[in-house]
């Protein structure tokens, strides 16, 4: 059976949760799920999928470093990229063609993923440290999002996640 690797770069865990949901949909391949910081060898994998989240408008540096260090391997395999960000909760920003973070990311890197998707993330105010809680609350206020810091808000469309996994033939 072919092997696939789902790699996540996450701050609060939603990207990992999305990877695990995708892995649970696998019918045609054996799937490993791994943090980007723990990936050591890509040789055994026919398919490599990278998911990364946005925090304060940026992907983590480890994502760019990983892509630069593994560009030739990524290009030689079936591959995909997905972004997780709360901006994607808005219909006019929930596809790779209209999501500003995906557009900037693709312009900034040399890798051209064969499949690209974007998923809305999660705001988990009770879990955040004081500074993050109020910085994110301010961002949500500006963008007309939820600001009740006693609540968590999950925007991820799990049907869309499962459809992406199916489209990748996992």
What are these regions (language model features)?
Residues 2, 43, 111:
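Structured loop/turn residues at beta-strand edges in well-structured enzyme cores
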Residues 2-27:
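N-terminal beta1-alpha1 ligand-phosphate binding loop
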Residues 7, 49-51:
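Structural motif
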Residues 25-32, 47-48, 55-170:
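FMN-binding flavodoxin-like domain, especially the glycine-rich phosphate-binding loop
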Residues 33-43:
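Short acidic low-complexity segments
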